């Protein structure tokens, strides 16, 4: 299958908060989005974990 599970990590505290799926054949770049981090208690940038 082309869809793989990925983990999103907070850029400030490095906590892994979200799990999602993406098609790695169509989207080769790393996913980056602003989401809520409960440890930072604010909306911060989350990037795809290596």
UniProtKB/Swiss-Prot annotation:
InterPro entries: Ribosomal_bL33, Ribosomal_bL33_CS, Ribosomal_bL33_sf, Ribosomal_zn-bd
Cellular component GO terms, alphabetical: cytoplasm; ribonucleoprotein complex; ribosome
Gene3D superfamilies (alphabetical): Ribosomal protein L33
Top-rank taxon, per record: Bacteria
Keywords: Ribonucleoprotein, Ribosomal protein
Gene Ontology molecular functions: structural constituent of ribosome
Similarity annotation: Belongs to the bacterial ribosomal protein bL33 family.
Protein name listed in UniProt: Large ribosomal subunit protein bL33
GO biological process terms on file: translation
PANTHER family in UniProt: 50S RIBOSOMAL PROTEIN L33, CHLOROPLASTIC (PTHR43168), LARGE RIBOSOMAL SUBUNIT PROTEIN BL33C (PTHR43168:SF2)
